[in-house]
Each structure stands twice: as structure tokens, then as C-alpha cells.
Regions:
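Catalytic cores of Mg2+-dependent Asp-rich isoprenoid enzymes
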Residues: 1-75, 80, 84-166
């Protein structure tokens, strides 16, 4: 790892942030605001993309911004997809303040299939899908900035996560 970090000039802070995000999963199982969730998503997913683009190679600094969006898009998609599974493990990644805005309680999230019948659930999910799509649109701008031979893997990941979101 040390050789890779040195060879590709990977910023140490990215790795520290990544580890911090993993630690969050041990100590935190709720997020109050979208800003809290964004910070978590950045640490567990965007940092991975930011490390990858250092290895892939890119043509403009703007690639970093798009790579951050790539991680947020993928992690939000995971969170939306895994609500029931996460709730079974007493983890609610969706921001509590946003859930409350739609009249959804913690016990509603933990109710399993009953959550699908909650009147606020569909509009809530639609809002979060729109958020994820906003980050997706920004993430796709990364591809032309990557070295040509490195585009295939991120393009495949983005397409796969886009199919999950649909």
C-alpha cells in the first residue's frame, strides 16, 4: 500500500477520512440531517472514488468534484436499496429530520414491508431518488476527464448503480 500511495501521490487525508467513515459504522447508527449523511457518504464512498482517480489518471482538477459526486450517488443508492436490511440491524442511514418531515417514524422504518404502505414513504423515496440522480448526473461528467483506458470500470459501476436506482 505504501508503494501505491507514493507512486500515485494519493493524499493521506483521503485514507484517514475513509477509515473514519468505517469507524462510523461501528459507533453510529442514525443520522439526523442530510449534511450528516453526506459527510458519512463522503468518507465511506467518495474517498474510494477519489483514491481511484489518482490511480486512473485524469485531465482536469474538476474530476475531483465529479468523483466526490460519484461516491455520494453510489452510497445514496445503496442506502435507498438497503433500508429494510439496515433497519433489521438497527441502522437507519436516512436522515431522521427528513423522515419526520414525511411523517415517518423510526418504528415505521423498522416495520419492514409495512413501511411500503406508509403514505409518506413513496414521496420520501422519490425525493431521495431525485437527490441520487442529481449526484449521478454530476458523476457521469467524470468519465471524459479520466484517462481513456481507465474509463471502463467507473462507467460500468455507474451504469450498474443507475440500474439499481431505476
Amino acid at each position: 500500500l505504501k508503494d501505491t500511495i507514493r507512486r500515485y501521490n494519493i493524499p493521506r487525508q483521503l485514507l484517514d477520512d475513509m477509515i473514519s467513515g468505517m469507524e462510523d459504522d461501528f459507533h453510529r447508527n442514525r443520522y439526523e440531517t442530510f449534511e450528516d449523511l453526506y459527510s458519512y457518504c463522503y468518507r465511506v464512498a467518495s474517498t474510494v472514488g477519489l483514491v481511484c482517480i489518482e490511480i486512473y489518471g485524469y485531465s482536469e482538477l474538476e474530476a475531483r468534484e465529479f468523483s466526490e459526486a460519484w461516491g455520494i450517488f453510489m452510497q445514496l443508492t445503496n442506502i435507498i436499496r438497503d433500508v429494510a436490511e439496515d433497519a433489521e440491524r438497527d441502522r437507519i442511514y436516512l436522515p431522521m429530520e427528513d423522515l419526520r418531515r414525511y411523517g415517518i417514524s423510526e418504528s415505521d422504518v423498522k416495520s419492514g414491508a409495512e413501511l411500503l404502505n406508509h403514505p409518506g414513504w413513496k414521496p420520501f423515496v422519490e425525493e431521495y431518488i431525485e437527490r441520487a440522480e442529481t449526484y449521478r448526473d454530476k458523476a457521469f461528467k467524470l468519465l471524459p476527464l479520466l484517462d481513456r483506458q481507465s474509463r471502463y470500470s467507473p462507467a460500468a459501476m455507474m451504469a450498474f448503480y443507475e440500474s439499481i436506482l431505476k
